[in-house]
From Swiss-Prot:
The family this protein is said to belong to: Belongs to the FKBP-type PPIase family. Tig subfamily.
Region (Disordered) residue spans: 430-479
EC class: isomerase
Keyword Chaperone annotated: yes
Subcellular location(s) of the protein: Cytoplasm
Start-end of Acidic residues biased regions: 451-479
The name this protein goes by in its record: Trigger factor
EC code: 5.2.1.8
Signal sequence, start to end: none
Organism: Mycolicibacterium gilvum (strain PYR-GCK)
Biological classification of the source: Bacteria, Bacillati, Actinomycetota, Actinomycetes, Mycobacteriales
Entry keyword Lipid biosynthesis: no
This protein's domain notes: Consists of 3 domains; the N-terminus binds the ribosome, the middle domain has PPIase activity, while the C-terminus has intrinsic chaperone activity on its own.
InterPro entries for this protein: PPIase_dom_sf (IPR046357), PPIase_FKBP_dom (IPR001179), Trig_fac (IPR005215), Trigger_fac_C (IPR008880), Trigger_fac_C_sf (IPR037041), Trigger_fac_ribosome-bd_bac (IPR008881), Trigger_fac_ribosome-bd_sf (IPR036611), Trigger_fact/SurA_dom_sf (IPR027304)
Amino acid sequence: MKSTVEKLSPTRVRINVEVPFAELEPDIDKAFKQLAQQIRLPGFRPGKAPRKLLEARVGRGAVLEQVVNDALPTRYSQAVTSESLQPIGQPEIEVTKLEDNEELVFTAEVDVRPEIDLPDLSTLTITVDPVSVTDEDIEAEIEALQKRFGTLTGVERPAENGDFVSIDLSATVDGKDVPEAKTEGLSHELGSGQLIEGLDEAIIGLSEDESKTFTTTLVAGEHAGREAEVTVTVKSIKVRELPELDDEFAQLASEFDTMDELRADLREKVTRVKTVQQAEAIRDKAIEVLLEQTEVPLPEAVVQAQVDDTLHNAIHGLDHDEDRFADSLKEQGSSREEFDADNRANAEKAIKTQLLMDAIADKLEIQVGQNDLSERLVLMSRQYGLEPQQLLQMLQQNNQLPAMFADVRRGLTVAAVVYAATVTDTDGTEIDTTEFFGPSGDQAAAQQGAGEDDSEAAVEVSEDTADDASEDDTADDTK
């Protein structure tokens, strides 16, 4: 087999492949064996009919068509390997010549990872805000804790902002009931803005067992984006009574004996949270600086595929009704033009970032170990409420392990970038990034649950599983 490559653009190539007919003999044998199992000829057991009779029955053209269908994927993969290409996305294959007993010639156009001129990572400078914990931050935590230990007491008066109410809801669209909008005994805090627009205004001033109907736009379900007449009935009204902020409260709400001890502990926790947030800002800034300093050619087909996928997901819940989608965007203060522009910009940035991180990972020879995969699986299993081993099986069944592998590798790459760069805060103080971005590959910056006990046993990821994920990482989530 011979193959050559034409560079159509920095991100797209055409592979020309010539396969001598002699090399197709195994594929021809396979095609005849399949036909022999499918076709029953008088006087022959299944699978035993001779080639000539099978060919006479179905025609030589049908046999060659089967041969081509079987041969193309394998020969394409061989050409990609021999030419050391890194495809992203699926190829467009065209058979340009098929001469019986002579040769098979086909072309394959495919997007590939571009060559990227990478900057010297040691020259990168990253600047972020310093970690600042104020007394107001601590008092906000105290207030939240105080509310958590408050008690609700019923009152006999019209509802006011800040009250807790139990309500019944129903809705109609064009005079017809909306079953999914009907609910009873729903608890709601007035002023929280957590439910539909206009609800709080309708409830305020109502007394127990009083109702009011108002007009609003539904944001979910079959009628999302449509105007509806919503009726709310107040069933009960309660106020929250807060405990005194004294040492007795500290003992009730924590393991500490005094409010001073509680405040000191909260200051440590807030500092830790803000330190993690700073690490996340460092990570994001590192990517931003790299994108500013590096030219990354974009594969248009890959960008368009991601744009289309995002749009599909956005309107899927609206039965792909473009008018309802436009109405929904309008209610959010946006428009289809703004959505499309943001969608494309986000897709371009995401794909540029992925290609850039992959190029740096290749240059730095970033390796993903079993521990790296195990840590990510444990983190993801917490987020999804699954056992790590159960999540691993789901990822394998859905062929999502390579995408996870690629994401972990990019995370390790960002850590390496940050560790090599100079990182300071806006006050000019250099920041020690070792904890989150050190050579150990600690992924703590990506873990929201900083400070939690990570002593639970990590899922065992076999070497074969890790190797399979690595080998499949050729057409990952840039598709």
